[in-house]
């Protein structure tokens, strides 16, 4: 599966997309696989000029999960809530349970711990690499503080 997260694979995806096309994919959990998430986003950024991570709680995984949208020019942050709602209405998607213009912007609003994680340098994944994540070490200290104290 590592081959699906490499710069080489992302270059092939970019070639397959039409201009303005968007690749959307999951990029692991910022809580449990932070180092891997950072590397996957570094890989995407090495290929696509626009990369926007977004977060959603995924009940199946029991944790916050990250996805990303990557494009040569389409930027999901450039859309207003009203524009997203208008596009949904135009396509007859009026009864969605999660997604709306407001949630579009909320999903793309990264919390401070994720912004700090992504501010650190990360090495892109290339053919032949592994996705071993040192943060998976059971002895590694991981603290997610939701309140002061």
Regions picked out by a protein language model, each given a short descriptive name:
Residues 1, 27-41:
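Conserved class I S-adenosyl-L-methionine
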Residues 1-2, 105:
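Generic secondary-structure boundary/loop-capping signal
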Residues 4, 8, 35-39, 65:
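Generic recognition of short, well-ordered alpha-helical segments
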Residues 5-19, 41, 45:
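A short glycine-rich, Lys/Arg-flanked "PGG" loop and its adjoining helix->strand segment in the class I
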Residues 7-10, 25, 41, 52-57, ...:
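Ligand-binding pocket scaffold of soluble enzyme catalytic domains
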Residues 20-27:
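Conserved beta-strand signature within the Rossmann-like core of class I S-adenosyl-L-methionine
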Residues 35-53:
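Short, electropositive alpha-helical surface patch
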Residues 53-149:
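Soluble small-group transferase modules, centered on the S-adenosyl donor enzyme superfamily
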């Amino acid at each position: 599966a590592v081959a699906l997260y490499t710069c080489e694979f992302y270059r092939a995806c970019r070639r397959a997309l039409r201009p303005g096309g968007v690749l959307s994919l999951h990029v692991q959990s910022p809580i449990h696989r932070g180092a891997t998430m950072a590397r996957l986003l570094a890989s995407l950024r090495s290929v696509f000029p626009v990369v926007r991570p977004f977060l959603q709680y995924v009940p199946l995984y029991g944790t916050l999960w990250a996805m990303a949208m990557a494009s040569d020019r389409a930027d999901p942050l450039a859309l207003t809530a009203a524009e997203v709602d208008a596009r949904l209405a135009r396509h007859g998607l009026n009864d969605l349970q999660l997604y709306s213009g407001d949630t579009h912007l909320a999903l793309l609003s990264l919390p401070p711990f994720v912004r700090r994680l992504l501010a650190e340098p990360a090495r892109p994944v290339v053919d032949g690499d592994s996705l071993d994540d040192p943060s998976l070490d059971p002895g590694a200290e991981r603290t997610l503080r939701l309140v002061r104290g």
